[in-house]
Amino acid sequence: MVKKRFHFSLQTKIMGLIAALLVFVIGVLTITLAVQHTQGERRQAEQLAVQTARTISYMPPVKELIERKDGHAAQTQEVIEQMKEQTGAFAIYVLNEKGDIRSASGKSGLKKLERSREILFGGSHVSETKADGRRVIRGSAPIIKEQKGYSQVIGSVSVDFLQTETEQSIKKHLRNLSVIAVLVLLLGFIGAAVLAKSIRKDTLGLEPHEIAALYRERNAMLFAIREGIIATNREGVVTMMNVSAAEMLKLPEPVIHLPIDDVMPGAGLMSVLEKGEMLPNQEVSVNDQVFIINTKVMNQGGQAYGIVVSFREKTELKKLIDTLTEVRKYSEDLRAQTHEFSNKLYAILGLLELGEYDEAIDLIKEEYAIQNEQHDLLFHNIHSQQVQAILLGKISKASEKKVKLVIDENSSLAPLPAHIGLSHLITIIGNLIDNAFEAVAEQSVKEVLFFITDMGHDIVIEVSDTGPGVPPEKIEAVFERGYSSKGMRRGYGLANVKDSVRELGGWIELANQKTGGAVFTVFIPKEKQRGNPFDSHRDCGG
């Protein structure tokens, strides 16, 4: 049988704990005060009984009553009654040395009382006993006669106080104390409820196990996210950093309790926190690194209590974007190749249906000769499959655009080194050839020449065209991102070429031919370079 487990909310637990503590503390305090008051009342009653007995024992009429059997009985009785009325005593007795009652208040039927040994030796005594069937506190004091050189105990005085009167006083005090305790408990319960509600509000209504689950999920997500994540408090001190952020910032491990401006100097994140403004996709430089950052200001009650910063390296994002762009271009080139062959197949099919067999054969031979010439040169001289695939796509695209793409017969290329990836080749070769296609689009002679060789220490790629060339004053500008004379959203191809060449440790030269047209020459070292000692591009002149 499965035992049913009871789950109590945080609010219930807090109220229960505080209530239990209040009950315990107030209960202990009430009992302590009650015991102290009870003991105090009893001591007060005992002291009053003894003090009254002593006072009466010193009175001359009382002493004379004991010394003389017939003396001052009426006067002594009057004194006793007065003392009884003044002190509120239940009964007062005057005894001789044998314990016989010589005088008593009221109409007591007692004839004799037992005396303690303390009385016989001149001491006072307090006891609890019964008188007329009622519980009393009895205080006794000796009656002492001074003789020459000594004192003699000739009798004693006993004063009784009812215990019920003391108990009533104690009960009254306990009732008052109980009322106060109940009021304090009630206020404590109300305070506990308010505190529990406030704590629940601070925890956004979440229970401890839910907070723990969210904490574990947060840590798992922060570990899985490849973006750098940093959070701060309202003072701009780092309270959280994931592993990716530490790696990007070249820190040995995630750090906290440091100002955000010390962790990411130059990013201006403290001003973001002070102004309470978000920064979407901002490019910032931190320690010679360029990041794309996004900031989110955390607000509560209209006040900022911290920021969350997410960031990635710009180069990583750029590589991803450029790769996607170039893969799309590569896909378009393959589509152009498919489209071109489809057109030629339909042309051959049409000639066959019309019975023009000789013309169909001539078209096939012509296409075969063109493809054979290009393919022989491509596959015999160039042994890099990546470059072969790119050029095949561009050949088909050139045919579709009615542009003559010529691969220089002196081209030669062995398999490329491992550090030169397909994305680099697509970016460099693809953009240079596409740029040449656009340059000759409005020319009467539409020809693009491609040359590649790996002789020497560098891989040399050269693309020339029969276009109008590049004005000398714009040679520097053509490699800037966004520069284009062809409209919006253009001017990124040559900038991407420059970036890819720099990543490979190479450089690019741009010149104008004497006969017209531009020549782009790229030099890429065969061995991977640690840095780039060359300029991003060089103008060789016309």
From Swiss-Prot:
It is found in: Cell membrane. One of its GO terms (cellular component) is plasma membrane. The chain crosses the membrane at residues 14-34, 176-196. SMART domains: HATPase_c. Residues 216-279 form the PAS domain. Residues 336-528 form the Histidine kinase domain. Keywords: ATP-binding, Cell membrane, Kinase, Membrane, Nucleotide-binding, Phosphoprotein, Transferase, Transmembrane, Transmembrane helix, Two-component regulatory system. InterPro entries: HATPase_C_sf, His_kinase_dom, PAS-like_dom_sf, sCache_3, Sensor-like_sf, Sig_transdc_His_kin-like_C, Sig_transdc_His_kin_SpoOB, SPOB_a. GO terms for molecular function: ATP binding; phosphorelay sensor kinase activity. The modification Phosphohistidine is found at residue 339. Disulfide bonds: none annotated. Its EC number is 2.7.13.3. It catalyses: ATP + protein L-histidine = ADP + protein N-phospho-L-histidine. Residues 1-13, 197-542 are cytoplasmic. Residues 35-175 are extracellular. It is an enzyme of class 2 (transferase). It is a multi-pass membrane protein. Pfam families: HATPase_c, sCache_3_2, SPOB_a. Member of the two-component regulatory system CitT/CitS. Regulates the expression of the citM-yflN operon. Functions probably as a membrane-associated protein kinase that phosphorylates CitT in response to environmental citrate or Mg(2+)-citrate complex. PANTHER family: SENSOR PROTEIN CITS, TWO-COMPONENT HISTIDINE KINASE. This is Sensor protein CitS.
